[in-house]
């Protein structure tokens, strides 16, 4: 039955992301004139099992994705109640009919799915996070700030993709976040002093990319910055290895720090680092099919949250394997990896039922939309990854979290987090 919540129009628009690459924004409007939008982010380091984007001209346009939104999705969703997220997403999945969303495009589908959710919350007069959370009162997640970039995110010789700080032992998100900013500023000063001011320019995610060659050089810089800022024992360290990117499948070796390491040698490498530094978070330490090696490392690093990103790609099929093998204590949550909000909810619900920590994440190619921050709060994610405290497409998410905490008085998850 047509009512004020019925979808009247779906419209696609080509915009750009934070790397200057084209992406798609989809608007969803109801019969009552309520409208919102969803943007499709894009990653630089991608798991092979992620939903496929529809792009043209070697990735230089998304005109076909826009046409799909305007001429296929628009009529398919016309008249559907915008509050029926499950029905909307099922229609998109059924029309696409591929396992990897390659017909309509994962980018087109996720932008539409996000737009529908945001429009529904707006039509009901609710904040997005409240619409997602329902009656429960969620907490603000702990931020994972990527402050030194390596791997595919940088032009230096570091193989580890992200070096992260986690401000945990604070009473509020604001206290935690601004403490992390102090560390970031200290790091900037150290880099300028040791390598020159030119290396304080920021990368895709707002982190620094000094001319480093080995993992310990980056960890030393961050550890020193934490101590200089006076937050030893309150701010911890983490890494996103993105190990698939430095794995040579022909040799079955990992090429890192000028060495070729087999999986067991790489495991010992991580164990040594965990003894030397306060590392409590380790993402994608092995290539994306190594469920057993993830599990072995997690078993030996019980106080560290080993986390799967490329391992799972926000896909329930692979999470079930990880649960069976006890591969990780944490999972990355990226809605665009799987393609719809409903599938993302299935993934996060299964993880929660198995006491696995949720790490909601941005992508390296982002827009200024702050949806992922509201989403992280709504699902009560334990952590949020959305870059360094720099660049507008990153700070928009942090500013939204500050606003939510201030306006609604939500408690900070780090206050109750035990290592």
From Swiss-Prot:
Protein purpose: Catalyzes the reversible conversion of 2-phosphoglycerate (2-PG) into phosphoenolpyruvate (PEP). It is essential for the degradation of carbohydrates via glycolysis.
Broad EC category: lyase
Single GO MF descriptor: phosphopyruvate hydratase activity
Family matches, as InterPro entries: Enolase, Enolase-like_C_sf, Enolase-like_N, Enolase_C, Enolase_CS, Enolase_N
Residues that, per the record, bind (2R)-2-phosphoglycerate: 161, 334, 363-364, 385
Annotated source species: Saccharolobus islandicus (strain M.14.25 / Kamchatka #1) (Sulfolobus islandicus)
Lineage of the organism: Archaea, Thermoproteota, Thermoprotei, Sulfolobales, Sulfolobaceae
Reactions the enzyme catalyzes: (2R)-2-phosphoglycerate = phosphoenolpyruvate + H2O
Pathway annotation from the record: Carbohydrate degradation; glycolysis; pyruvate from D-glyceraldehyde 3-phosphate: step 4/5
Protein name listed in UniProt: Enolase
